[in-house]
Structure formats: C-alpha cells, structure tokens
Regions:
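PLP-dependent amino-acid enzyme catalytic core
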Residues: 1-349
Length: 349
C-alpha cells in the first residue's frame, strides 16, 4: 500500500504502452501523466521548488511566479498549495480554459498576457517581461525560470532517463519532444553518458524557432518555443523531426480511437516517431517515446470538431474520420556535429 501526505510525493514512473497495434511500428510510449499534476512537468516543478528551498530563495511568505502555457503551471499550483506558498502563473491565450480553472481551483493567480511588445519575441517574451516586472516590484515573488533552470533538465537526468533504461536495456532510439528542452536535455545527457549507442531524436512542432526554423503561429500549447531555449545543446541530439500541428491533431484522434486519450504534446511526439519509424524502422528495433500529458485538458480544442475545423480547415477535420495512418511524413533532419561542452568528455555515438 502506498501512503502519501503531499500530492507531489506520488508519481507513476514505469507504465509503458505498446503502440505497435495502433501505429503499425515498434514503439513504446512512456506515460508521464499519472500523477496529481497530470503531466511530466511534476518532475521539473518538484526539482526546481526543492532547489529554491535549499538555496533559501523560497521561505514562508514567498510567492512562486512562473511563465507557463499550462502543465508546469498546474504542477506548481499543486505544490504551492501543498507547501503554503502563493503562486502566480503568467500565461497566454493558448492556455485552455480548463487548465486555467484548474490552477485557480488550487489557489493560484493566473494572469493572461495578450499584448506583444516585441514581435520577434512573441507572447513568450511578453510573458517573461511581465514576470520580471512583478518580481522587481515585490521581493516576495520568486521566479523559478524553467527556461534556464538547470534543475529542469536534471530532474529528467535523475528520473526519466534511468526509468527508461531499466525497462529497455536494449533501447535503440528515443524520441523526445522539445519545449523548454528540459526533458529532452535530461534524457539526452544521461544516455550520452551511460548508453551512447542510443539514438536521440528530438521532435518539435512547425512554427517553433528552437532549432532555427522560422516562427509561425502555433495553437497547441506544450512543445515548441518562440525563442531559442537556453537549456538546448544540440550536440547531444542525433536527429530532429518537425511535425505540423494538423498531424498532432490526427495522432491524438488516432490514439483516442483505440481508447487512449492523450494531450497535444503526446500527439506531436507520436506523429514524429511514426514518420521516422516509417522511414527508418525495422521490426526488431526497440524505440521509446514519452507522453508528457493526458487528454482531458484538450477536450475543448484538439478533440473539439468545431475548433479543429476553425483552426486547420475542413480537410483536416475530414481526415479525422478516415482509417488510422493518415499522418503526413515529417522529414527527419540530421543534426550537425559540433564540439561538446567542456563538462562532457565522450562523443555522441
């Protein structure tokens, strides 16, 4: 029997779904949403809060503040409520109503940024500017800064990657979505040091500038960035797959038709992994990807036909009723080999 006294103490680490019957390729999906925060962001949130407490930055009366499109905000709302801190989440209109209501139910203040002062930095830049202004005006406010916080990727170095390795000692390729790149860099660094034969494939969404692509409008929160992630070190990554948001929606519905309701970020990584495996896979390949969240918070967007039609058009809406397998082929992009940083001595295999 498991007994806990605080909600962040529980997290299911070792549940995997065999997706071969769904996508027709060998792929195991690591489910990260089985905790009270509902997403993989619980790990980073717990790690960053614990570090801030050890450093004396968080103390009684502190107010945690963070820029988040949703999942990290929920995780921090839960932890702040449990530990007695205030919490301010700074988000933008892509954060869906259900997520905002969930944060508020946990006692958080939610501020939605709608105006962009610098088009080059977009809504994310506007969110961070607002965070800085609030912190400058009130010393109680403590910005954890998930975009630069080393405890973000270290949480996945300590937990996510070893959990995958324990279950798949013969792993060939790992697909990881790229947002702040905390999950990506934590897993990539761990496998580089301990299992360098594992191929690391990053999955990002078209419109994200993380890997140097042009910025464009993105409607699904989670993966992708409007500025280059400070945590990103491309030398740990072997390939990149870019996924259209329409294919994210198709992948989500494809999974839902088999009874698995996952969030938009999961649809993106499954779509990217499916296209890569269709081009490069073998029946004896061992491949794993990570499902960052579940689908309940996307019922009024990704799973809502009117929303899909308004955003992506009639063709995409009609494609959701077709037989599984209509994911378009996202192109794998080889990553350039660049020198490793001084803290790493071995080479990427």
């Amino acid at each position: 029997m498991t007994v806990i006294s605080q909600p962040h103490e529980y997290n299911q680490h070792d549940l995997f779904i065999d997706l071969r019957p769904v996508i027709g390729h060998p792929l195991f999906l690591k489910v990260e949403g089985l905790n009270f925060a509902g997403s993989v962001k619980l790990k980073a949130a717990s790690g960053m809060v614990a570090a801030a407490e050890r450093e004396g930055r968080l103390r009684p009366g502190s107010v945690i503040v963070e820029s988040s499109s949703g999942n990290l905000g929920v995780a921090l709302s839960m932890i702040a409520a449990s530990k007695g801190y205030g919490f301010l989440c700074v988000t933008d209109p892509r954060c869906n109503l259900q997520t905002r209501l969930l944060m508020e139910a946990l006692g958080a203040e939610v501020h939605v940024v709608t105006e962009v002062a610098d088009p080059a930095r977009g809504l994310l830049g506007a969110r961070m500017d607002y965070v800085r202004a609030r912190c400058a005006a009130d010393p109680r406010y403590v910005w954890l800064n998930q975009y630069e916080n080393q405890d973000n990727w270290q949480a996945h170095y300590r937990q996510t990657a070893p959990a995958i390795d324990r279950q798949f000692p013969d792993l060939d390729v790992l697909f990881v979505g790229a947002g702040t790149t905390g999950t990506l860099m934590g897993c990539a660094r761990w496998f580089h040091e301990h299992r360098p034969s594992v191929r690391i494939v990053a999955v990002d969404v078209v419109g994200s500038v993380s890997f140097g692509g042009p910025a464009s409008t993105r409607m699904i929160p989670g993966l992708g960035m409007g500025v280059r992630p400070p945590l990103l070190n491309e030398s740990y990554i072997d390939e990149l797959v870019m996924v259209e948001e329409a294919d994210t929606v198709r992948a989500c519905h494809r999974l839902a038709r088999r009874g698995f309701l996952f969030g938009g970020s999961t649809g993106t990584v499954v779509s990217g992994a499916t296209s890569w495996l269709a081009r490069n896979g073998r029946d004896d390949l061992t491949a794993v990807t990570i499902a960052p969240d579940l689908g309940e918070r996307y019922l009024d967007t990704v799973y809502q036909p009117n929303w899909v039609q308004d955003i992506y058009g009639d063709d995409v809406l009609r494609s959701l009723d077709l037989d599984a397998g209509r994911l378009s082929e996202a192109l794998p992009i080889p990553m350039p080999r660049v020198p490793m940083d001084a803290a790493v001595t071995s080479e990427v295999a």
